[in-house]
């Protein structure tokens, strides 16, 4: 399971936040689920606040998702936010640095930004800093930051040269996905695809999972249960007047626990035995 954290929740209640992380890990481990935690994120809403969050917008993909640090860093006073981020990252890493329930730290999700205003290469200094913080703590688990946009040359170079495990995102079909794998193989490190599976993009379990298994690449799709994130709806394709789209974009299970597609679940089971 890949789980996103946020510095504002830590800042609001440090000990409570770490307690809840541990409670989640206990539940996940009971069900034989290992975890990748994500720290920073350049996707979706750049402004946020603590407390009750906005209600999801009907039919809109990820309407409530918050970047971290977002505008606090890119439009604010970096001298104020950087020490907070450093303390946050180091505190979590030190607390869980030898926790075997965590398989990897994903330091920065999609640096450069997607889902609205993009920071582009401006994200490189912060990316470099979080790797420095991570190496200072030196946790037992590997550190990584997934490549996701091949046009972000400087970011990609740093990510690939500094990640213990090569992680990447792609929602393309089999041929494009295979080309990306062939490119990333040259680094000679273990690989995990930490985001894939968008049905309307021809990135499906039935097509992609056999390829990843053949290539000995770990696979984490986006989305488990349809819920407040509304990721059954596609990016930039709001459908506010329908309960669900004709073809789900992400996610595996309905809110009642039944699978969206029995065929998909059988495919996943057969490939993970």
Go through each PLM region and give its residues.
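Active-site mouth of glycoside hydrolases
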Residues: 1-163, 169-176, 187, 196, ...
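Catalytic domains of carbohydrate-active enzymes that cleave complex glycans
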Residues: 270-273
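Structured C-terminal subdomain patch of bacterial secreted/periplasmic proteins
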Residues: 229-239
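Conserved catalytic-core segment of NTP-binding enzymes
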Residues: 180
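Conserved active-site loop/cleft motifs that coordinate metal ions or position small ligands
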Residues: 192-195, 218-223
């Amino acid at each position: 399971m890949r789980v996103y954290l946020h510095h504002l929740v830590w800042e609001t209640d440090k000990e409570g936040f770490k307690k809840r992380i541990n409670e989640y890990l206990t539940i996940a481990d009971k069900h034989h689920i290992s975890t990748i935690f994500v720290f920073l994120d350049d996707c979706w809403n750049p402004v946020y606040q603590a407390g009750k969050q906005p209600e999801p917008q009907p039919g809109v993909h990820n309407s409530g998702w918050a970047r971290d640090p977002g505008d606090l860093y890119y439009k604010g006073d970096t001298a104020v936010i950087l020490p907070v981020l450093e303390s946050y990252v180091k505190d979590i890493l030190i607390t869980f640095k030898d926790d075997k329930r965590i398989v990897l730290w994903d330091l920065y999700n999609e640096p450069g930004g997607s889902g609205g205003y993009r920071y582009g290469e401006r994200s490189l200094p912060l990316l470099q800093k979080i790797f420095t913080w991570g190496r200072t703590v030196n946790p037992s688990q590997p550190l990584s930051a997934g490549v996701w946009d091949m046009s972000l040359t400087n970011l990609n170079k740093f990510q690939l040269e500094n990640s213990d495990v090569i992680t990447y995102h792609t929602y393309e079909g089999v041929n494009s996905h295979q080309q990306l794998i062939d490119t990333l193989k040259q680094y000679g490190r273990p690989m995990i695809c930490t985001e894939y599976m968008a049905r309307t993009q021809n990135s499906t379990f039935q097509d992609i999972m056999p390829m990843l298994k053949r290539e000995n690449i770990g696979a984490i799709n986006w989305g488990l249960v349809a819920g407040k994130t509304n990721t059954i709806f596609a990016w930039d394709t709001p459908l506010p007047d329908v309960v669900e789209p004709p073809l789900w974009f992400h996610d595996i299970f309905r809110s009642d626990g039944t699978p969206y597609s029995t065929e998909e679940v059988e495919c996943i089971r057969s490939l993970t035995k």
